[in-house]
From Swiss-Prot:
The active site is at K109 (n6-amp-lysine intermediate). GO terms for cellular component: cytosol. This is DNA ligase. It comes from Streptococcus pneumoniae (strain 70585). The lineage of its organism: Bacteria, Bacillati, Bacillota, Bacilli, Lactobacillales. Residues 577-652 form the BRCT domain.
Amino acid sequence: MNKRMNELVALLNRYATEYYTSDNPSVSDSEYDRLYRELVELETAYPEQVLADSPTHRVGGKVLDGFEKYSHQYPLYSLQDAFSREELDAFDARVRKEVAHPTYICELKIDGLSISLTYEKGILVAGVTRGDGSIGENITENLKRVKDIPLTLTEELDITVRGECYMPRASFDQVNQARQENGEPEFANPRNAAAGTLRQLDTAVVAKRNLATFLYQEASPSTRDSQEKGLKYLEQLGFVVNPKRILAENIDEIWNFIQEVGQERENLPYDIDGVVIKVNDLASQEELGFTVKAPKWAVAYKFPAEEKEAQLLSVDWTVGRTGVVTPTANLTPVQLAGTTVSRATLHNVDYIAEKDIRKDDTVIVYKAGDIIPAVLRVVESKRVSEEKLDIPTNCPSCNSDLLHFEDEVALRCINPRCPAQIMEGLIHFASRDAMNITGLGPSIVEKLFAANLVKDVADIYRLQEEDFLLLEGVKEKSAAKLYQAIQASKENSAEKLLFGLGIRHVGSKASQLLLQYFHSIENLYQADSEEVASIESLGGVIAKSLQTYFATEGSEILLRELKETGVNLDYKGQTVVADAALSGLTVVLTGKLERLKRSEAKSKLESLGAKVTGSVSKKTDLVVVGADAGSKLQKAQELGIQVRDEAWLESL
């Protein structure tokens, strides 16, 4: 029976690849169904012999308890956006300062959800959401139900790949029709539908909704020397790669491709929101490197957003956690990019003055970045009133005088005891990218604050289970879960805490870099600003902001109270030792190591202060080689780069 099961699995997987990947099926649907039923019968009779790559794993039927957090071995960065030809020219100019004659590759920007797939010996072991780029959610069981994701590869290798999971337009129409017939609310657009599907705990629902993928990058160190070759290799392994792409030598060629794609966009069977432009050569990518948030070798051109007219009804003013007062327009409802919009940001007082926005104006509304509704401009021909908008002089939360500094575009409340700022700071502290306290969302925080149960973030860790029962709508089970989530967050690595403190200019990526270097918040507290400013990708603005924050008496008291309540202040990831043997060196691993796993070798190099990259370039300091090192060894020798072997690495 085992032989026949192997034959059936191989046949069915081949036919599935022909259907979903190549769009060239060699058997009829009825023949596929007959073989599939035969396999199901054999697996029912011999469950102990079910193969890891059996297509029956895709049917669903498993109900999950939830999704566990998963740390990405290779971080997922965001891309810098471009919205005009001029911004593409500026990107090209920056690249050419480092790379004399770059070739670019242009790929479609799929409007879906970023995913990371990890394979060991060619078998899918983890499928993970992007999350914050460092930590995502393990949705492996759901991604196994996406029919074009291979459960096994054509080669038995360890590899991590990146891609987009999306819902084709035809599937979206079918899903919404079914929801309409069942009296359920329809999804606003295919991206929302894909996101909702991947968050399903019932894998059978995922299997029915016909999601699809395009893979676009090998995240683990690649043996290819260009993005184009990498895409072809992904196809060889069994992944679906979008065929619509070009190589370009200049911005004229890129712009022509963008115009062509823009005209074809509505006829595609899936949604796209732009074109991604990357430097094709991987060694040049290494030379260009990264900022804190994004690669310097890529940019995402975004298509112009859809625009609609709406009438301005009124303006609300709200205070953020840094004291900035933001105006929001209340509008007559309009349909915009698949959703109903009745509120849109007016950004700040300077923007209102610049656009000359007045009471009852008809305005043009769009979605900035296809996400945030914003007022773009006034339709002056439809103006009905010359009366200007009322600009507040006092904080809408604490009534303190508002200030408008010369170097800032927004009004600001500088009262440190402003209730709105404190509450927004608490919400930020508990958010996913910060301390990630499940269940402690804005509504619960507002109730805790109103009940005077929390005044600062340290108070969160003084809460007891019974405190939550004082809040309207919170039952015993929810109170227990909230308390447990707060206790669990005490064990977070310290970069989550640092970001959660809401220090100006210190984002999540900067927090991680700081803690990798200083190892604990207490060490960072003692550091001088010159040392902070010297860290690669950071600088004087962040250093000054930290110095200002830590100079306040309140920050010292808060850190002491957090430590007393049991909150971890130490970094739990891979740290950088300033005086380590390889501190500050860029190292490439290549070839097959005999004794160390590649992941072990990478971890050891990083623990010794090295930055491990995938391609050899002029910025590479050292190459560690194993057997069959190939082109990377040859390039290192051509560039005169130091070469060492596995035994040398083990001796350190």
